[in-house]
Amino acid sequence: MRTETDEIRDNLKYLALLARDYPSQAAAASEIISNQALLKLPKGTEHFMSDLHGENEAFVHILNSASGVIREKVDAVLGDTMPEAARAELATLIYYPTEKLPQLKERCTTEDALEQWYTQTLLQLIDICRLVSSKHTRDHVRSCLPSSCGYILDELLHAHFEDHDKDLYYGQIVGSIIENGRADRFIVRLCELIKHLAVDKLHIVGDLFDRGPRPDIILDLLMRHHNVDIQWGNHDVVWMGAAAGSPICICTVLKTTLAYHNHGMLEDCYGINLRHLQRMAEQFYGEDDLSIWMPHTDAARGPYTQGMLHRCAVMHKAISILMFKLECQVIDRNPDFQMQGRDYLRRINWNAHTVQVGEKSYPLRDTAFPTVDPADPAKLNPDEQLVLQKLVQSFRQSEKLQQHIEFLYAKGSVYHIENGNLLYHGAVPMNTKGGFAVEHFEGRRYSGRALMDYCDARARRGYYGAEGSAARQSGQDFLWYLWCGKLSPLFGRSAMTTFERLYIADPATHTEVKDPYYSWYNDEAACRRILAEFGLPGTSHIVNGHVPVQEKNGESPIKGGGRLVVIDGGFCRAYHEKTGIAGYTLVYSSRTMSLRTHQPFESAEKAVRENLDILSQKNILETENHRILVEDTDEGEVLRERVHDLKQLVTAYQLGWIPEARCEDHVW
């Protein structure tokens, strides 16, 4: 029978490495005590958001406001002493400190008035910060403080007043901050600290990219966030493929951005050069009837000149035909994708100007195909080859895009399990009988969790596979499949009917049939089967995005008897009319799980100027019988393992198997 001593002896190599960080019994014991104390703290608050679709202003505001949590803290601290309008103004200062601060200072017409405002505001922010920091250890709060003013903020937040006057103490420190011209800096730092501490973990359940104006701003913010994970959406993986240099993914990304007149983001933010594409487009399509290629526009982002619209439309047509050619090639290379019926350029009757879809033929809305050889429709002409070469080079050499996509790979996955919640963007493909759909890839069968794991691994091949290797090519093709494939867990529909919507007038061909999953996820037993497939008990939750909840028509985001929550509420401006709302945030605190429903957001400029907040309705989904502590979470399991290892290290020191460092600094 193995003893604890046997286990320690087996772990000596690891314990010797651990001893580098804790070189004495005292140091190890101190860390044990610290970790055991952490286990008894309340669980940190988690926020879940999905389907941001590049809508940066709404996302930034919801991130800054912590989905309404910060306003609740302001009201809790100051509700009895401060009028509503003043609380709204203070909340706006916390959300946008660098933008709001100059506006508020302008009101102070004298030095005395400014000093009084500084004093009042600093004290109010300190009180709010003390509240939001109460769930954290002092060490954790210290680690969040900027080095330039961390010591003073630590004193302000953690001072005790048993034997001295609080007002006098605070007054002396705040007065010194103002006197030395540091008030602005301290206000900004306190606002940032409040936002940091209000949300412990952020989960983004897919689709950062799409038609919205600035996905790059969203990714810049997420890269600076202290604790975030991402579950890839189908819009994300096609950008991942584009950054990897996949021609089909590059064309797909360009087609979407041009269809919504958002190519300026590609040019200005990512430095993608569209000059060669524009030149080729004008050469072959400049005189065509471009009526079906005109971009969708947002009046709020206009005005648009005819020249701007023409430039966009002609590139839209050029890149779409290039994309349809490449789709034929990818389908040829990957028969296991089972997409042979979607090589539409090969299904056109060039004499009758019709295309065959299934068993029927339909007239084409646009019959001009000057770059297509009817004898070999998938073949690129020399001009298209040159354009594609330049585009691949531009996407591969975009430093900012590569940083963003590496971040998506580092922080992202097809699914994620944390604290009893299963997170994924699209679906776990199912059949009509409620079982998991079976797919065959590379000679093997996959379904359920195994399919999701396979998709994750092959998606990584497309970016990290060796240059020029078959594995890299296969992975890039698969990233495109994840975008639009029939059994893609990120797509969850029968087909992406892009060709049909462009070229065929009959709306019956535009239908994208949802995976049976979207019927079965209303069934509690089916949701429990999904949870069991991922090793979770039936009391856990599934957090799902991808399909906008039509709340205005009475649809509920709560499915499967409360086991599943759909959190796609339509962040994207284009979906507001469809959903009747402007997004959800799921909030999981130590006491409750709640869903916050957001109303449309006008603009950051108006929010700063008029103290306008996003109106959000809070709906409690579950209330815990007892407050959830860190020891009840996945983090708690990690901490317990850490304590176990440290206790073994202490024993190894006591047995003399690992020598202690002789340093008085470790005596306590």
Model-derived segments and spans:
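Feature recognizes metal-dependent phosphohydrolase scaffolds
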Residues: 1-668
